[in-house]
C-alpha cells in the first residue's frame, strides 16, 4: 500500500513538473513559436510524371547536374488530406550527393507555398520515416513488458517522463536562451529521482542510488566547467553551433557542451549507482550487524567489476555517434597533433573522459553513502517456535567471521551435555 501511494505521488509530481516546466521554458520563446506554425503534411507518391536532368558546370568537377523529378502524391495528413497534388523533388549531385529519387508508393513529407498569383506549389521535403520507427519502438516496449512485466510497465512510465523532460522542457528552455547550466542540473536531478522511485519504489536503496548518481553527475559537471576554461573552448564545434547562434544569440554554446556531457552520462552513472546500491543492500541484509568498513570494501570490489564495461560503453557510444566525422578527419592530410587540437575532437574527448570520470567517482560515492545508511540497520532476528507449551529459541545464522567459532562452541557444549547425561545413566544403573 505504501509503495502504491509513493508511486502515485511521484507520478503526479512528475506530471506537474512537465506542465509547469514547459510553461516556464516556452516563456518568450519566439523560435518555437515560429516552428510550430510550419506544416509538413505527409503524402504518398502515386505516379512519376517527369524526370529532367540539367548539366551544371563547377570548376574542377565533371559530370555534375541537377535532377528535377515531378510526381503526383496523395496528401494523407493536414488540411489538404486526400487531395492529389503535383510536387517536385530537386536533386543536385554537387550539393546533395546520392539522395534517393522518389518512387511510386514512397511516403514523403511535402511543403506547400503560395505564389503571388495564389497558385499552390508543392515541394518534396524529406522521406517519412516515422512509421518504421514507431514499429521499432513498439517492439522495444513489447520486449520491456515481456521481460519486465510489472516493473516493465514502471520502466515505460519513467522512460516517457525522461523523454518529455528533455523534449518538452529542457530543449525549449535552451532555445529560449535560458540558463543552460541550471536547467541541466534540474533535468538530470528530475530524471534520476523520478526514474529510481517510479521503477524501484521508495527505500534506502532508492535513496542511495539517487544520491550516488547525483554526486557522480555533479563531479562530471564540475570537471567540465574546469576543462572548458583550461582548453579555451568556444562552443563552435561544427556548423550546427553556428546555426544555433544565428537562431538566438543568447544561447551559450559553451554551456551546451556542459549540458551534452551531463545528459549523455546520467544514464550510465545511474546504472552504476543502482548496481552498487542494490548489491550492497543484499550484502548488508545478510549481515546480523552491518559494519561500515565491510560494506565500503564490498562496494569497491563490486565497482571494480562494473567500471571496465561501463567506461567502455560510454566511450564507445561517443565514438560511434561521431564516427563519420572521425573517419573524415582521420583520412585528411593533417597531422595527428593538429587533429587532436581541433575543438571538435577536443570536445568529443572531453565528453568521453568527463563522463567516464563521473562513472568512476560514482563507485566510491555510492559505496560510502550505502555504508552510511545500511550500517545503521540491525538485521538480527530471533525466531521462536512453540511446541507443547515449551518455548524453544532458535539461533539465527550469522554471516561473519565468528560463525565457525560459534559452531565449535555449540558443538562442544552439546558433547559435554551428552557426556554428562550418559554418566548419570551409568551411575543409576549401578
Predicted regions and their residues:
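Hydrophobic alpha-helical transmembrane segments of membrane transport and translocation systems
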Residues: 301, 305-308, 317-430
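Transmembrane alpha-helical segments that form the functional core of multipass membrane systems
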Residues: 138-245, 251-264, 268
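Hydrophobic secretory-pathway targeting helix
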Residues: 1-38
Amino acid at each position: 500500500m505504501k509503495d502504491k501511494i509513493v508511486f502515485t505521488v511521484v507520478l503526479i509530481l512528475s506530471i506537474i513538473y512537465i506542465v509547469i516546466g514547459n510553461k516556464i521554458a516556452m516563456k518568450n520563446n519566439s523560435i518555437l513559436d515560429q516552428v510550430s506554425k510550419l506544416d509538413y503534411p505527409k503524402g504518398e507518391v502515386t505516379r512519376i510524371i517527369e524526370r529532367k536532368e540539367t548539366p551544371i558546370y563547377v570548376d574542377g568537377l565533371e559530370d555534375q547536374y541537377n535532377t528535377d523529378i515531378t510526381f503526383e502524391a496523395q496528401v494523407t495528413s493536414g488540411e489538404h488530406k486526400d487531395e492529389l497534388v503535383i510536387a517536385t523533388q530537386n536533386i543536385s549531385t554537387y550539393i546533395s550527393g546520392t539522395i534517393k529519387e522518389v518512387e511510386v508508393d514512397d511516403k514523403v513529407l511535402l511543403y506547400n507555398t503560395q505564389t503571388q498569383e495564389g497558385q499552390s506549389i508543392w515541394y518534396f521535403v524529406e522521406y517519412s520515416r516515422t512509421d518504421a520507427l514507431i514499429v521499432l519502438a513498439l517492439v522495444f516496449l513489447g520486449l520491456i513488458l515481456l521481460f519486465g512485466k510489472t516493473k516493465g510497465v514502471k520502466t515505460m512510465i519513467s522512460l516517457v517522463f525522461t523523454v518529455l523532460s528533455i523534449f518538452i522542457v529542457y530543449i525549449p528552455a535552451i532555445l529560449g536562451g535560458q540558463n543552460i547550466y541550471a536547467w541541466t542540473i534540474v533535468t538530470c536531478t528530475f530524471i534520476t529521482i523520478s526514474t529510481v522511485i517510479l521503477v524501484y519504489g521508495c527505500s534506502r536503496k532508492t535513496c542511495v542510488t539517487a544520491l550516488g548518481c547525483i554526486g557522480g553527475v555533479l563531479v562530471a559537471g564540475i570537471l567540465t566547467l574546469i576543462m572548458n576554461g583550461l582548453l579555451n573552448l568556444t562552443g563552435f564545434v561544427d556548423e550546427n553551433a553556428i546555426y544555433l547562434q544565428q537562431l538566438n544569440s543568447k544561447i551559450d554554446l559553451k554551456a551546451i557542451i556542459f549540458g551534452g556531457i551531463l545528459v549523455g552520462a546520467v544514464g550510465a552513472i545511474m546504472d552504476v549507482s543502482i548496481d552498487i546500491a542494490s548489491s550492497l543492500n543484499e550484502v548488508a541484509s545478510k549481515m546480523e550487524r552491518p559494519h561500515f568498513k565491510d560494506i565500503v570494501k564490498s562496494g569497491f570490489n563490486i565497482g571494480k567489476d562494473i567500471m571496465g564495461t561501463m567506461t567502455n560503453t560510454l566511450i564507445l557510444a561517443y565514438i560511434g555517434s561521431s564516427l563519420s566525422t572521425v573517419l573524415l578527419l582521420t583520412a585528411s592530410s593533417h597531422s595527428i597533433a593538429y587533429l587532436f587540437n581541433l575543438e571538435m575532437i577536443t570536445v568529443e574527448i572531453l565528453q568521453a573522459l568527463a563522463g567516464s570520470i563521473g562513472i568512476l567517482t560514482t563507485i566510491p560515492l555510492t559505496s560510502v553513502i550505502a555504508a552510511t545508511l545500511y550500517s545503521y540497520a540491525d538485521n538480527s532476528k530471533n525466531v521462536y517456535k512453540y511446541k507443547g507449551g515449551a518455548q524453544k529459541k532458535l539461533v539465527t545464522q550469522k554471516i561473519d567471521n565468528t560463525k565457525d567459532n560459534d559452531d565449535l562452541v555449540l558443538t562442544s557444549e552439546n558433547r559435554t551435555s551428552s557426556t554428562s547425561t550418559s554418566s548419570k545413566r551409568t551411575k543409576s544403573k549401578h
